[in-house]
Amino acid sequence: MGQKIHPLGFRLGVIKDHKSCWYADAKRYPELLQEDRRIRQYVEKNLANAGIADIRIERKADQVDISIHTARPGVVVGRGGTGIEQLRLGLQKALGGQRQIRINVIEVARVDADANLIAEYIAQQLERRVSFRRVVRQAIQRAQRAEVKGIKIQVSGRLNGAEIARTEWVREGRVPLHTLRADIDYSYKTASTIYGILGVKVWIFKGEIIPGQEEIAAAVPAQAPRRQQRRRQQFEDRSSEG
């Protein structure tokens, strides 16, 4: 079943946390849940060119804390902070009420190791009518440079304008979907082309997380770096086959 279930939902409470963190009674829960969806849709629509990787929402009484993880923080903040202020005012107007909205902008450290950003890159290239095999090969090479443990990319639809829709996928390295401690990043995007909609799915395996390992690692002091450089992991690119 690890092949069928959503990789992030499968690991909630084990190694993954919820993207919305708040508590509410039964009467207000549906309202706040729909409000979270409106917030995410508004941010993704107004910051479509900012490379949004993740949106986290926390609530404290009448205060809403929104953390935006982005590859281009300068686009979100704007000159002199005008961009983030316009976003905050727009959200207040869209939500209504007297809620205090606080926005935190966090830069993504490893852009090429984020499934959401890679899926968005593939979708944008497909909309520009670039060959899907070339796009997938480039995305895999970018992920390899980011030293991920494994990556799987699947593209579905009328590929290269073919009459019959089909599904093509490429995997490099390990992507253990059934292992709960495996840190799997997953994203799904759609590309609108003149031939129809193409679906893009990306799985990225970043390594294994053992619960409690972070506390043990923090307690042990860091050792001096070795002089011998660690050999980078190599992948065999099979995206051109078939």
UniProtKB/Swiss-Prot annotation:
Swiss-Prot/TrEMBL keywords: Ribonucleoprotein, Ribosomal protein, RNA-binding, rRNA-binding
Disulfide bond positions: none
GO process terms (BP): translation
Domain of life: Bacteria
UniProt GO molecular function: mRNA binding; rRNA binding; structural constituent of ribosome
KH type-2 domain location: 39-109
A family per Pfam: KH_2
CC per GO annotation: cytosolic small ribosomal subunit
Comp. bias (Basic and acidic residues): 233-242
Annotated function: Binds the lower part of the 30S subunit head. Binds mRNA in the 70S ribosome, positioning it for translation.
Family as reported in the entry's similarity comment: Belongs to the universal ribosomal protein uS3 family.
Quaternary structure (record): Part of the 30S ribosomal subunit. Forms a tight complex with proteins S10 and S14.
Name recorded for this polypeptide: Small ribosomal subunit protein uS3
Organism: Microcystis aeruginosa (strain NIES-843 / IAM M-2473)
Origin organism lineage: Bacteria, Bacillati, Cyanobacteriota, Cyanophyceae, Oscillatoriophycideae
